[in-house]
């Protein structure tokens, strides 16, 4: 028994060593913001307790996904993401010392890179396999913001931010800017706020803009990808105002999750993608739009039924 316990402890030494060498307070930005998120979720749930904005099982899905995401993301950060970013940083073009003004510039650059990541996550099926978890809820509330996938680091979402590291920004500052970006985005997942002042709506991502992004009707799909800013959508033609979007129904168009099984929520779309790949023998499925396989093989594409949500 002692020997077995010793072997198990020894097998964890490499992970503890990685944490000791890589750990930094910036890694815990979203963890430190979690109490704030919890307060706002509780306030919103109480405010809309009789309106159907919150659903018990849907909220359970979101909280479960969010908590497990934070844990797995921290592990994969030190095991995979930071070592890879560190290698790129060792081959950087310049060395950029971070000052307050330069950090503002970095934040704006990371926001631009986030737009690329977010747009790619909707239009490339490989990345959609991770991002679909966030869009699986048919509700729009603060809890939905926490609905994230363990699969993100494995799918390679961090690859989109390597240009900032290659230019000379230390990886942790890049990830810190991204964490602040994601922290802001928590507050746009709500129906509590109607519209912000016109100047704010023109520049920043807002609840109004993001409600459109989470819609599944034709006018709402693949729109409003910005994280903190909406200017990239205006520049690149992906912006749709809520007043022009029609009635919004939340969720996804195909394979809407109906299971409480966390493994199904996280990996269900991955299984579907690999099944399509095996069935059609077409590698383009990996990088084409998630709907492409149904358009390319309409006679053979059959959305698979999913189990009903637990009562």
Task: Cite the ranges covered by each PLM segment.
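Central hydrophobic cores of alpha-helical transmembrane segments in multi-pass inner-membrane proteins
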Residues: 35-46, 81-85, 107-113
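Membrane-interface helix-loop junction between the first two transmembrane segments
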Residues: 41-60
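Membrane-embedded catalytic scaffold of the fatty acid hydroxylase/desaturase
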Residues: 67-79, 92, 96-249
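Short, strongly hydrophobic alpha-helical membrane anchors
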Residues: 2-27
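Alpha-helical transmembrane segments in multi-pass membrane proteins
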Residues: 20-37, 57-73
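Membrane-interface helix termini and inter-helical loops of multi-pass transporters
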Residues: 15-18, 84-95
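Cytosolic-facing loops and C-terminal tails of multi-pass membrane proteins
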Residues: 4, 245-311
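Alpha-helical membrane-anchoring segments
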Residues: 9-13, 34, 38, 69-83, ...
